């Protein structure tokens, strides 16, 4: 990382280079390093920016994503670099961060991610108060000797999925059982992060049945399960949730349509609540 900074802490230009170990076979290396590259300029926007990244084949096992998808590496290097800048220009690190962090309403030109709320400053205020940061920062200046104390904070920015670097897609199948319960299949597989629970809650809320009546098979059979691109990049609930919600709403409409055919009551006056089809006007 190379940064050109004015004495008042204004970022003038930045350059970022990164390499990703791909291993001996093609895997997620390209999108992992690209995610880090994409996150780097968004945290501290700068008008003049150059980012280059490379995927490198090595004589090692195939490399892939595991908890972070390229962004933690870029954030670690970037935040260490920010502290080096502050030391070089004699500026308090948190003051520099507040000056340069992306403002509310900022939209990144590459990913189209937008910052909707002032959460960065809120988190920094809370963290600094809990650490008693200002007092410790002043107290720990100008130390000598082999053992010294220090205090610091870093800012982390992360987003889900890999769009626009790679394709994002998800699909879902739902089956209504004879007892009124429901089972669904999705290619976005549970690997311990709790997405099946989130999915079940989405289905229950969208269809209008108790969550106890929603069943999902965590170990999916790829022969019969709709296609999903995988469990990576913190994408499960966000990307998989869209296909699940659309399928659940379509199933709900189909159930109400059948109720209309049986009762001749318009679908517009019917509702599905807690597993029961009712009239909206009186709940009966």
Show the residue positions of the predicted features:
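C-terminal, non-catalytic interaction/recognition modules in large multi-subunit enzymes and RNPs
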Residues: 173-183, 266-284
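Phosphate/diphosphate-binding loops
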Residues: 1-23, 241-278
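Acidic, glycine-rich active-site loops and adjacent beta-strand->loop/helix elements
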Residues: 5, 18-23, 50, 102-106, ...
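Helix-loop-helix junctions that connect adjacent transmembrane helices in secondary transporters/permeases
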Residues: 100-181
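Flexible glycine/proline-rich, aromatic-decorated loop/lid segments
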Residues: 20, 49-54, 171-175, 210-236
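Beta-strand segments within the central parallel beta-sheet cores of soluble alpha/beta enzyme folds
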Residues: 12-17, 46, 93-102, 138-155, ...
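Alpha-helical support elements that line or immediately flank enzyme active sites
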Residues: 31-41, 65-100, 122, 126, ...
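Glycine-rich loop/linker segments at domain edges
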Residues: 2-80, 159-169, 235-238
């Amino acid at each position: 990382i190379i940064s050109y900074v004015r004495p008042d802490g204004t970022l003038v230009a930045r350059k970022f280079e990164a390499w990703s170990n791909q291993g001996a076979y093609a895997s997620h290396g390209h999108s992992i390093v690209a995610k880090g590259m994409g996150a780097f300029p968004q945290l501290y926007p700068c008008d003049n920016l150059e980012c280059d990244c490379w995927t490198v084949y090595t004589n090692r096992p195939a490399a892939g994503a595991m908890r972070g998808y390229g962004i933690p590496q870029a954030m670690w290097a970037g935040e260490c670099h920010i502290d080096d800048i502050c030391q070089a220009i004699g500026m308090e690190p948190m003051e520099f961060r507040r000056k340069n962090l992306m403002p509310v309403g900022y939209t990144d030109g590459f990913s189209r991610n937008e910052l909707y709320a002032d959460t960065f400053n809120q988190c920094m205020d809370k963290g600094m108060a809990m650490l008693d940061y200002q007092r410790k920062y002043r107290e720990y200046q100008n130390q000598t000797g082999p053992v010294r104390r220090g205090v610091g904070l870093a800012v982390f920015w992360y987003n889900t999925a890999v769009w626009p670097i790679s394709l994002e897609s998800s699909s879902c199948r739902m089956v209504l059982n004879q007892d009124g319960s429901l089972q669904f299949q999705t290619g976005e597989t549970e690997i311990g992060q709790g997405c099946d629970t989130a999915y079940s809650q989405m289905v229950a809320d969208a269809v209008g049945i108790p969550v106890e009546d929603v069943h999902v098979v965590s170990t999916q059979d790829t022969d019969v399960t709709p296609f999903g691109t995988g469990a990576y990049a913190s994408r499960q609930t966000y990307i998989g949730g869209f296909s699940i919600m659309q399928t659940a709403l379509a199933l709900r409409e189909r159930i109400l349509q059948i109720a209309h055919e049986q009762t001749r009551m318009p679908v517009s006056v019917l509702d599905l609540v807690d597993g029961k089809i009712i009239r909206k006007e009186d709940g009966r």
